[in-house]
Amino acid sequence: MKLLLFTALVLVVISLVEVEAENERACIPLEKECTKTPGNCCSGLKCDCYRRFEQGVAKGIQCWCIEKDVTYKGV
């Protein structure tokens, strides 16, 4: 009985460690593209999107993980 409980506990711990490691790998770091997965920026970051133009023609939307409290302005 003790062996069964110990084995179950070990399996639960291993599962939790694997899930946590998977979640850490899933986040997108600072200044990396998040167009397809806007909710996956790492902690403290937000996905900010911009419409891209080339010679006045819209070429799509691109999104990047940036710091939450930072505002960027064009020069």
UniProtKB/Swiss-Prot annotation:
Pfam families found in the cross-reference section: Toxin_35
Tissues showing expression: Expressed by the venom gland.
Alphabetized GO MF terms: toxin activity
Keyword terms of this UniProt record: Disulfide bond, Secreted, Signal, Toxin
GO cellular component, one term: extracellular region
Compartments, record wording: Secreted
Post-translational modification: Contains 4 disulfide bonds.
Secretion signal, residue range per the UniProt entry: 1-21
Prosegment residue ranges: 22-25
Major localisation: secreted
UniProt family annotation: Belongs to the neurotoxin 19 (CSTX) family. 06 (U6-Lctx) subfamily.
Record-given protein name: U6-lycotoxin-Ls1d
